[in-house]
Regions:
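Intrinsically disordered, metal-sensing/regulatory segments
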Residues: 1-258
């Protein structure tokens, strides 16, 4: 039950965020969008470092001066994996009119949801890897540290859900469809976590690689998607401040609970 709830928490964050469409005005202001994107970026960056990369290096201490190697390899594989998906799947970032990936006849709404869904894959994997390590009895991964990561991702998923559903409504979609689009973007997270847990026999022996893989993929999303979003327009300073807030929140969660 503890693992089930831990896997579900990030998805609930997306769902609650998407529900903002029912009680907020039709569109988010530029300042709010910059703040939300900055906060999400800060949480993801801190989670990548404190919850994933540092544990990956610590678990490789037996390699001595080469303890950085598994983390470096996994990190790069994660970055390249997301880069490959970006090239293979048509998608549209929030606030952009230029689609990325191969040419497609998909509507802008569908491609926008695809973009967030695509970038939620590593978050689901990160949660799955943490709980796989905890269930396997890894001394460096506790129930509290796994929960800290789940809570951190849920916190950053809340604004992410709103960033999807609110613009969809502003583009003419009904509140129900806009909410569904926001929720749909987060479905991949529990699916990714469950699939990772099912592959635990493969994951556990190579845990440092999988932890750093998730970190690399998440930081790719931060740099490629969220930082440009938080830096748009005249409110970039707000985005930077909320990046620091998000980073501090996630760092505190990880240290306090981990």
């Amino acid at each position: 039950m503890e693992t089930f709830l831990g896997i579900l928490i990030p998805f609930l964050g997306t769902t609650f965020g998407a529900a903002c469409v029912f009680f907020m005005k039709k569109s988010l202001g530029d300042l709010v969008q910059c703040a939300l994107a900055g906060f999400a970026a800060g949480v993801m960056a801190a989670a990548s470092v404190w919850s994933l990369l540092i544990p990956a290096i610590e678990q490789s201490e037996g390699m001595g001066k080469l303890s950085f190697l598994p983390a470096s390899i996994g990190f790069w594989v994660g970055v390249l994996f997301l880069l490959m998906l970006d090239r293979l799947i048509s998608h549209l970032h929030v606030g952009s009119n230029q689609a990325e990936g191969p040419k497609s006849k998909l509507g802008s709404t569908t491609m926008m949801v695809l973009a967030v869904t695509l970038h939620n894959i590593p978050e689901g994997m990160a949660v799955g890897v943490m709980y796989a390590g905890f269930l396997a009895g890894n001394a460096q991964i506790t129930a509290a540290s796994a929960l800290a990561l789940s809570l951190g991702i849920a916190i950053q998923n809340f604004p992410e859900g709103a960033i999807i559903s609110m613009p969809l409504q502003a583009e003419g979609e009904s509140k129900g469809k806009a909410f569904f689009g926001g929720v749909l973007s987060g479905v991949v997270e529990p699916i990714g976590a469950v699939l990772t847990l099912l592959a635990a026999q493969l994951v556990i022996p190579a845990l440092p690689y999988f932890l750093s893989f998730a970190a690399g993929a998440m930081l790719y999303v931060v740099v490629e998607e969220l930082i440009p979003e938080m830096s748009q327009g005249k409110h970039s300073n707000i985005g930077t401040i909320f990046f620091a807030v998000g980073f501090s929140v996630m760092m505190t969660l990880d240290v306090a609970l981990g």
